[in-house]
Every structure is written in structure tokens, then in C-alpha cells.
């Protein structure tokens, strides 16, 4: 779950910037699908966790894999992603060549976006 100060506002940003689809909405807790993966947003309320702006640093690193990481990051940057924004570049990894870049969303969460997941080898074919 990503801690955010205002779950409805964050859900709107993720929808507009990352193409998120809302799965369900309880007000302060919202379920989304981003790049085919379920993501939960929640507003902390003095229960032992907090969002990055109050912590003063990122509290999570989100990894997303998609067909076009350049476009995914481009949409995020155009919608206001700032901070640790790095363009997509090629990485030589044990599972093969992998293109990856990153950005920080307006809520302080660090996102890494790549084109090839090392976990893909474990996913059964459809």
C-alpha cells in the first residue's frame, strides 16, 4: 500500500499520469490497477506508517514492467513527476538486456519502470 496524504487526489493523479484503473474505493483506501498490477493507496492516520513528504524520504520503491517504459515515464513527467527522474537506459542483467528508467511521483514514491521483468520466467504461459 502506498501512503498518500489524500487518496482520492492521488488516485486521480495515478489515473491521469499512469493510466490507472480504479478497482474499488473506500474513501481513504483505494484499490487501483497500474500496468496490470494491483496497487493500494491509503491515508495514514497515526497507525505506525506515513507518506514520504512527512518522512522526508521515499518509503517504497515501486517496480513496474511494461512494453514502453519511455512512454510510461514520459506520461508521468508530463503530469508532474519530479525528483529522481532518470531516462530509460539499457542495463545488462543476468536475465538479459533490460531497459529501465525511473521517476518520483508527486507523493514522493520512487518508481522504476522497465521493459523486462526477471520474474517473467516464472509466469506460466497463457
Task: Map each language-model feature to its residues.
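Short, surface-exposed ligand-recognition loops at beta-strand->loop->(often short) alpha-helix junctions
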Residues: 2-6
Amino acid at each position: 500500500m502506498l501512503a498518500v496524504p489524500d487518496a482520492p487526489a492521488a488516485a486521480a493523479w495515478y489515473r491521469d499520469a499512469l493510466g490507472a484503473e480504479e478497482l474499488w474505493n473506500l474513501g481513504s483506501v483505494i484499490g487501483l490497477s497500474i500496468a496490470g498490477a494491483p496497487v493500494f493507496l491509503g491515508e495514514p492516520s497515526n497507525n505506525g506508517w506515513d507518506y514520504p513528504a512527512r518522512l522526508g524520504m521515499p518509503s517504497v520503491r515501486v517496480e513496474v514492467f511494461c512494453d514502453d517504459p519511455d512512454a510510461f515515464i514520459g506520461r508521468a513527467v508530463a503530469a508532474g513527476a519530479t525528483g529522481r527522474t532518470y531516462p530509460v537506459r539499457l542495463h545488462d542483467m543476468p536475465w538479459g538486456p533490460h531497459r529501465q528508467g525511473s521517476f518520483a511521483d508527486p507523493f514522493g514514491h520512487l518508481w522504476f519502470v522497465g521493459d523486462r521483468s526477471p520474474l517473467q520466467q516464472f509466469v506460466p504461459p497463457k
